């Protein structure tokens, strides 16, 4: 496999994409963030797009939250499963993230959850999402970074830190494949990748009140009891940032939280 060859059957390689319980839990978390950012009770009347939808569980949750929902992916086996189960309420299409089959300014909400590291051209994907998102619309981002201690796809410590050849060798020695495909950006690189958006960081709000954001499955109870300064000190060790990016200048419109979202600069 070449370094950035497209992954055309990702759900066949990563069983976690078919774990319905965990995927729906992730969906509830991201919907809670979106609702707070937009200051809405549900997504009724909004048009939503899940980029990299695979088997469709997150897209289905968006639809059940009231949004007219679309899902795109190049993972045709995953899309076949999605259409079979959820095709009556979600429009699923085979499409690349850098060539979305939607008009300019046509989406209110876009989801890009743990996807950028797995696509051939992240910059092109992010640019085309910006094109289809309406002014004032939001892009939900679940983004890992290069310095995460535990790499989330293969659950191997420090894997994303390594040069390609060493990462491939590590993966083989661990019995988890032959080629490490994912490519993570540093935190500074992530800020550059999403520089066209007004980005707000919800990572600390989720850590401070995981129940409100349906994150209590992954956030230990003791973490939520830490003061804000201590939570902020933990941020470099957090493997996934929870960001909400507005097209144009925007700010969260939901009620006050125990810890407020911070603008990413």
Which residue stretches match the model-derived regions?
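Conserved N-terminal segment of class I S-adenosyl-L-methionine
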Residues: 1-103, 109-111, 238-241, 251-265
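Short N-terminal helix/helix-N-cap motif within the alpha/beta-hydrolase-1
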Residues: 60, 77, 119-124, 151
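Short conserved AdoMet
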Residues: 64, 87, 120, 134, ...
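A short SAM/SAH-binding and catalytic strip from SAM-dependent methyltransferases
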Residues: 109-120
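A short glycine-rich, Lys/Arg-flanked "PGG" loop and its adjoining helix->strand segment in the class I
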Residues: 123-138
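Conserved class I S-adenosyl-L-methionine
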Residues: 138-167
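Acceptor-substrate binding/catalytic loop of class I
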Residues: 173-188
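A C-terminal cap/extension of S-adenosyl-L-methionine-dependent methyltransferases
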Residues: 187-265
């Amino acid at each position: 496999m070449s370094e950035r060859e497209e992954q055309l059957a990702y759900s066949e390689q990563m069983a976690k994409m078919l774990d319905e319980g965990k995927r729906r839990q992730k969906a509830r978390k991201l919907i809670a963030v979106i609702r707070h950012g937009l200051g809405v009770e549900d997504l009724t009347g909004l048009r939503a797009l899940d980029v990299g939808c695979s088997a469709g569980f997150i897209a289905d949750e968006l639809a059940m939250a009231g949004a007219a929902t679309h899902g795109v992916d190049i993972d045709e086996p995953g899309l076949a499963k999605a259409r079979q189960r959820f095709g009556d309420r979600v429009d699923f299409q085979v499409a690349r993230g850098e060539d979305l089959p939607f008009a300019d300014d046509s989406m209110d909400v876009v989801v890009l959850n743990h996807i950028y590291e797995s696509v051939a051209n992240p910059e092109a994907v992010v640019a085309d999402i910006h094109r289809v998102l309406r002014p004032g619309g939001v892009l939900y981002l679940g983004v890992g970074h290069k310095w995460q201690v535990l790499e989330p796809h293969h659950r191997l410590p420090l894997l994303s830190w390594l040069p390609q050849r060493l990462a491939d060798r590590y993966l083989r020695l661990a019995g988890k494949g032959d080629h490490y495909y994912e490519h993570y950006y540093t935190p500074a690189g992530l800020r550059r990748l999403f520089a066209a958006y007004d980005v707000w960081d919800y990572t600390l709000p989720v850590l401070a009140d995981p129940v409100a954001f349906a994150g209590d499955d992954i956030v230990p109870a003791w973490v939520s009891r830490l003061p804000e300064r201590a939570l902020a000190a933990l941020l470099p060790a957090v493997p996934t940032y929870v960001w909400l990016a507005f097209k144009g200048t925007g700010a969260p419109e939901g009620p006050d939280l125990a810890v407020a979202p911070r603008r990413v600069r």
